[in-house]
């Protein structure tokens, strides 16, 4: 099975549009470094990879995941003022699905009191509000995959202790249908998983889960409708026999139906425990 690994004062050229940036990124070989440098100052090293990374940062300056303008200060991954607009989740959260709950003495949200998921636990980075929705939409539909560098690193910075306590063996991204991946040029869950995998030192198994059916848009469906929509949508790919604990990664957690469907497939394939991470989670309906 193939293991997948992730990669990021002089005058600045006029920035390209999202679609032009996406095309340029796709036509440029991925740098060998696992962690893109955090600044755009000229590299001290004469290494080819460092020089190329510096040149790319000059030609294609970072854009903010929230406002989509060139990031200030230069070298950061998000504008400080914009970062304050993101709703980072804080305790108390549901100990199963990861949603914020109001009562500090409660461990589960109302939904998880009624329904127990097959996965052990899910956590998320931010709440799915209008700001998060716009940012994730740009990632999925305008080629702004570089926004996931920020979200993946921030996920490990803020939730890394919890993720490490799960004693994960590998990360598996939730797959999109091949036709959608060809249209976008990437699977946003895979890119997010790659960034997190590099930060955590974990392998990413993209082929462990596959999608055979293009499901209908499900953002307005309830949990039962989503489960029906996802019926037979996924199947298991090659999975190492010694893989015991897996972190399933997706961009949005709504009802948990997608995570539940993927968990069911992984458990049937021999994985012992499945944990989940979502970039954003919707509030309880």
List PLM regions with ranges.
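Glycine-rich phosphate/pyrophosphate-handling loop used in enzymes and phosphotransfer proteins
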Residues: 1-250, 254-285
């Amino acid at each position: 099975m193939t293991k997948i690994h992730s990669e990021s004062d002089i005058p600045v050229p006029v920035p390209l549009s999202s679609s032009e940036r996406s095309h340029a990124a796709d036509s440029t070989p991925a740098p060998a470094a696992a962690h893109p440098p955090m600044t755009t100052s000229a590299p001290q090293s004469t290494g080819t990879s460092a020089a190329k990374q510096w040149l790319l940062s000059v030609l294609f300056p970072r854009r903010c995941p929230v406002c989509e303008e060139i990031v200030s200060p230069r070298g950061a991954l998000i504008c400080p003022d914009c970062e304050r607009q993101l709703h980072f989740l804080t305790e108390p959260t549901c100990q199963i699905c990861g949603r914020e709950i109001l009562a500090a003495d409660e461990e589960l949200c109302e939904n998880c009191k009624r329904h127990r998921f097959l996965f052990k636990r899910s956590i998320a980075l931010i709440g799915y509000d209008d700001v998060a929705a716009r940012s994730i939409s740009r990632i999925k539909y305008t080629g702004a995959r570089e926004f996931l560098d920020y979200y993946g690193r921030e996920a490990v910075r803020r939730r890394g202790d919890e993720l490490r306590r799960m004693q994960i063996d590998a990360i598996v991204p939730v797959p999109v249908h091949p036709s959608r991946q060809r249209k976008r040029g990437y699977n946003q869950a895979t890119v997010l998983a790659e960034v997190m995998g590099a930060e955590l030192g974990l392998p990413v198994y993209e082929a462990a889960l596959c999608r055979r059916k293009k499901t209908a848009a499900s953002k307005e469906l309830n949990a039962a409708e989503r489960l029906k929509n996802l019926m037979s949508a996924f199947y298991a790919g090659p999975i190492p026999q010694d893989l015991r604990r897996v972190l399933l990664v997706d961009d949005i957690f709504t009802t948990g139906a997608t995570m539940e469907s993927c968990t069911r497939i992984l458990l049937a394939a021999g994985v012992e425990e499945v944990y989940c991470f979502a970039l954003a989670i919707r509030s309880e309906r």
